[in-house]
Amino acid sequence: MLEVIFLGTGGIMPTKERNVPAIALKYGGEIILWDIGEGTLRQLDTTKLSPMKIEKIFITHFHGDHYLGLMSLIQTMTLWKRERPLYIYGPKYTFEFIQNYLKSGFFRPSFEIHIHELGETRLKFKDYEIWSFKVDHGIPALGYVFKENDKRGNFDVEKIRELGLKPGPWMKKLEIKGKIEINGKLIYLEDVTGEPKKGVKIVYTGDTEQCERIKLFSERADLLIHEATYLSREDKGDSYHSTVEEACETAKRAKVELLALFHRAPRYKYEEYVQEANKICEYKFIIPQDFDVVRLGEKYELSSLR
């Protein structure tokens, strides 16, 4: 089970209703952050998520509402005597910005910080991959994909019998090794299991205008978190942001399972935004508020930590 915890769902500046962007992915005892706007540390405290469990932070771009919470997080980790390394990823200039950021106060982290600048990259970890892709925001900016590894299918009794075998202790050995020899014949795991189960796929656009790369990287995602700062093109003007209609168009074309409309402009009250979005968007969507949680497995569940 993967949990997507919306720590901040607004854009541009914090309001009484919502904080600026930060999303926590809770998976296998690890916490990954997508963006870390100012006040994220307080949001983590509200949700009882431990900052010490954060392993990786992926920053989409260097506008303040997406990264200004980083300093307070690093300082708190140091006060709590963290020793484990922290990995920070971002677009071009990430190394320069983070290095300058860390020189802006009279403290030094108690742990190593590894900084990685990404283009369109695929990062492989034990149980999942994270892909980065370029978006259109007028400055170096990235979107991210979390792709859980596919899981092997269940043992198929019919396939086992067709090979003249019976279920037994050998199955555990095969599961560990991937192949074993039985009665002089080499048996592979895929010979006796069903179709692999697709791993969960989540996409986060960060700030962007509508662009084709989002559609390409989002195809058949379980969840697309698409910025939808404005309700209309008139409100949007010439900014490098998206409207609700544009986010819905992309989700429909990419055939995603669920769309989350994200990064609402401060001018909109939640009720107003929901009312207008329901008129505009014909696709299956949610409008998360701060502390909402989406749990993804074979189906999704929506709840709140408020």
Curated annotation (Swiss-Prot):
Is Hydrolase included in the keywords of this UniProt record? Answer: yes
What cofactors does this protein use? Zn(2+)
Q: What enzyme class is recorded for this protein?
A: hydrolase
Q: Which GO terms describe its molecular function?
A: 3'-tRNA processing endoribonuclease activity; zinc ion binding
List the disulfide bonds in this chain.
Answer: none
What's the catalysed reaction?
A: Endonucleolytic cleavage of RNA, removing extra 3' nucleotides from tRNA precursor, generating 3' termini of tRNAs. A 3'-hydroxy group is left at the tRNA terminus and a 5'-phosphoryl group is left at the trailer molecule
Q: What is its EC number?
A: 3.1.26.11
Pfam families to which the protein is assigned, alphabetical: Lactamase_B_2 (PF12706)
**Binding sites annotated in the UniProt record for Zn(2+) 1:** H61, H63, H137, D207
Note describing how the cofactor binds? Binds 2 Zn(2+) ions.
Q: Provide the binding site for Zn(2+) 2.
A: D65, H66, D207, H263
Residues annotated as the enzyme's active site: D65
Record bears the keyword Nuclease = yes
Keyword list, A-Z = Endonuclease, Hydrolase, Metal-binding, Nuclease, tRNA processing, Zinc
How is this protein organized at the quaternary level?
Answer: Homodimer.
Q: Which NCBIfam families match?
A: PRK00055.1-3 (NF000801), RNase_Z (TIGR02651)
| Recorded family membership | Belongs to the RNase Z family.
Its annotated function is as follows: Zinc phosphodiesterase, which displays some tRNA 3'-processing endonuclease activity. Probably involved in tRNA maturation, by removing a 3'-trailer from precursor tRNA.
What is the protein named?
Answer: Ribonuclease Z
Gene name tied to this protein: rnz
